[in-house]
Regions:
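Context-gated lysine
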Residues: 24, 61, 68, 85, ...
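Acidic, carboxylate-rich catalytic segments that either coordinate divalent cations
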Residues: 98-131
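Active-site-proximal alpha-helical scaffolds that flank and shape metal-associated catalytic sites
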Residues: 1-74, 107
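Structural signal for well-ordered, non-membrane alpha-helices
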Residues: 38-41, 45, 80, 84, ...
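Long amphipathic all-alpha helical oligomerization modules
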Residues: 69-103
Length: 131
């Protein structure tokens, strides 16, 4: 994996999570990783169901196999339930802060997956694109 550069969207996403991990408390961290856990559990299940007949030769088979499991889904459910318990007594302002962290994570997940789907590994401003 030499000469591989993390995409701009992946870098933005991981930088955001690392910033939260280094500067916030455990609840913020759990909320920050929830979109990833939730999406991966959902995608693993869906991809396994949709491509069951063709997965054996797919280079992403091991990825799908890991994330399609009931165990991974249950871990995601546990994470959500644990967050709900921790936030139960939080102030409305604190809940808004956590919602913002979650929404940012969802947006980052969307951009990460969209950039992979579009095979957009780098970002170039319009003035710097090849003609």
């Amino acid at each position: 994996m030499n000469n591989v550069r993390q995409s701009a969207f992946a870098r933005a996403y991981t930088s955001n999570i690392l910033s939260i991990a280094y500067g916030k408390d455990i609840l913020d961290i759990l909320v920050a990783v929830l979109p990833c856990a939730w999406v991966y559990a959902d995608y693993g299940y869906r991809l396994a169901a949709e491509f069951a007949d063709t997965l054996d030769d797919n280079p992403y088979k091991s990825w799908v196999d890991m994330y399609k499991t009931d165990e991974f889904w249950q871990d995601s459910v546990w994470l959500l339930e644990h967050i709900e318990k921790l936030v139960a007594d939080a102030s409305e302002e604190r809940k808004r802060e956590l919602i913002d962290i979650f929404v940012t994570g969802v947006e980052n997940e969307y951009m990460f997956w969209a950039s992979a789907y579009d095979m957009q590994y780098t970002w170039k401003p319009k003035w710097n694109q090849e003609r």
